[in-house]
Each structure stands twice: as structure tokens, then as C-alpha cells.
Amino acid sequence: MSIRIKLKPGREKSLDRRHPWVFSSGVHNIKGKPLRGETVDVVAHDGRWLGRGAWSDASQIQVRVWTFDKEEAIDRDFFARRIARAQAGREALIREKGLTGYRLVGAESDGLPGITIDRYANVLVCQLLSAGADYWRETLVSVLAEQFPECAIYERSDVDSRKKEGLPLVTGLLHGELPAMPLIIEENGIKIAVDVEKGHKTGFYLDQRDNRAMAGRFVEGKSVLNCFCYTGTFGLYAAKAGAASIENVDVSTLALDTARHNMAINGLNDDHVTYSEADVFKLLRQYRDEGKTFDVIVLDPPKFADNKAQLNGACRGYKDINMIAMQLLKPGGTLLTFSCSGLMPADLFQKIVADAALDAGRDAQFIERLSQASDHPIGAAFPEGFYLKGLVARVW
């Protein structure tokens, strides 16, 4: 007999729409004593079967649903099918863009809640962020080793969200032999250095690939200020597209050193590139006070809101930084601005940037709305998967 989670009356509606989360507030009772991460069946208050997922006693999300098919067992074959499907769905993109770095599995949006897997050359980097993902760790490694025998497998489960699942932060080699860092990946004919051990997230921001390429349309012969540049890839694309000058700004010495390395491995002269180790907010205010201006500014900040309680503060932060950036733009200049917080609705982000233009005393036109690259799909039943929002604004 399976372990069964019965929901309170009326709490089945989201599962009927195939949303994969069951919150603790919706649970009526539990039949059995599930281990953390163990597979459980979820039923409506009237006993109707709804889904099968992983139990988490520590999290507010107490079940993350693996399948809505009553006949589908959660076993090694299940994970093999889901991972193979995820790879198959990305094959055309890999060929088209010449990718050696891409997101292989995007958690809930690929039907594998809590499991993120990125490929960098011949290394697969896993983040196992839920109790269920952690429970099936050995099975996942076995499946990946079978389907990608050429790849080492490395874990970067050093994300605070694991604490909400009652799990420790973990990093380390899971399979094979890790090559020397940095790895070199390619996208759109451009080489990028990635350190999967010390880099942000799994090592790099693959989700901005299309936006980096698109930015090249605006920069030929222009001065570019690339804020929160990390390893300088917006600047790298700008250099390739013929920007007259580029300033890469980040607080990390290591990131800026990698930005220099990225220019070198692409055979690009960086005499027209400067690297500023600085707090972006302070530097933008300094430049405003000095009367400095630019043709193009990129704002790609880290996440400002990790939870709903932080959203109001995040709104103020986004408004402030976009206002100052607009004040630094020459008339007719271009602002590329992003939010990577899943809690920030796209319409609210656009309103914040519009309000920033008013406060800056500038006229602005939105000419592009941007999102994450297509190897970061958004599940139709999981709108939370739409986390990266971007705008291109022409500022007068």
C-alpha cells in the first residue's frame, strides 16, 4: 500500500491544472510515515487520485509532484525517460547555436522538480534542491553516466534553498574525473571560460545567451557600460559587434580576471576595454556626479528578492538603479535592464522601469521585452518558471 497524502477540501484545484506543488497548508492528513524525499500518492479530499511525488517534511512545499499519470512508477526508468526527453528537446538548439554549454534539465519545467542540470563541455553540473531530488541522487548519477558516458558529473548543491528542505549544502565530484578549470564552452561562435567549482550558480549564466547576442545590434561604434558584468560576456559580445569602448563593472576580482581571459581566448584586442572593480550603485552615482555619459548601459544585477517579504525592497532597488542609469545615457541611448527574480512579475518590472524614467526626467520607449533562452523552458502549468525578465529601452 502506497503512502497517501490527503488534501483539504478544495485544495486539489492546482493539481488538476498540473501545477506540481502541494503546500503544507493544503494537507488534511497523511496515511503512513514517509521518509524525507520518499514517493507518496496525493489524493483529493474525496479520495480521487491526483498525482505522485516526493515528500518533504521540512518544507512548506510538502510534495513536489513527479507524475500525474497513475500508471507511471517513480523508478530508474522514470528518470531515464525524463532526462532523455529533456536532451531530445534541446538537440535542435544545440545544433543551431553550436552550443557546448546548455541547460539540460530545468527542474519543474522539465518534469523533474528540484533538479537542475547544466552541461559545460564534458562536465554535467547538478543542483539537487529538493528532498526528492536528494533522495534519488544515486539513481540520477547512474542515469546521467549511462546517457552521457563522456561526461564527468559534479554537484553544486550549495544553495540556501536546500536549508528549507532540511538538507545540508553539498558540493563535489559525483562521477568521473573533473578537468582542470576553467572549462571553455562555445555559443554563437564565441568562447567562454567557466569555472564549475567556484563560479556563480552552476558556473555561468546560460539563460542570458540570446540576450547577449541581441545586445550586439545596439553597440557598433558606441560606448558601453556593462554593469554587474560577472565574467564580462555582454561586453564580450559588444566587442565582437564593434563597440567603440566598453567598461565592465563587477565587485569580484576573479570575475574581472575571467572577463579579461574571455577577451583573450576569443582573439579580441581589449585596448578599448576597461575593467572596474566597484560597487555598481556607488559607481553609477559617482559617474552621474561627474557628468559622465554612455551610449549603451547593461544592468544585469543579482536577484534582489528571494521571498515575498523582500519584494518591496527589491522594487525600490530596481527603480533606483534604473533611474541613475537613464541619467547616464546620452539622448537616444539604449538601456538593457534585467530582473532574475521569479517573484517579480514582468508587468511590475516594466512599471518600475517606466517610473524610473519619470524620476530621471527622461522619455523612454520600450523596444524589446526579453526572457530566458529556450533551453530554460517555462512549463505551461508552472508560471514560476518564468523568472528572467528583461527590457530594452530607448531613452531620450
UniProtKB/Swiss-Prot annotation:
SMART domains: PUA (SM00359). GO terms for molecular function: RNA binding; rRNA (cytosine) methyltransferase activity. Keywords: Cytoplasm, Methyltransferase, RNA-binding, rRNA processing, S-adenosyl-L-methionine, Transferase. The keyword Cytoplasm applies. Residues 2-79 form the PUA domain. It is an enzyme of class 2 (transferase). Specifically methylates the cytosine at position 1962 (m5C1962) of 23S rRNA. Belongs to the methyltransferase superfamily. RlmI family. This is Ribosomal RNA large subunit methyltransferase I. It comes from Shewanella amazonensis (strain ATCC BAA-1098 / SB2B).
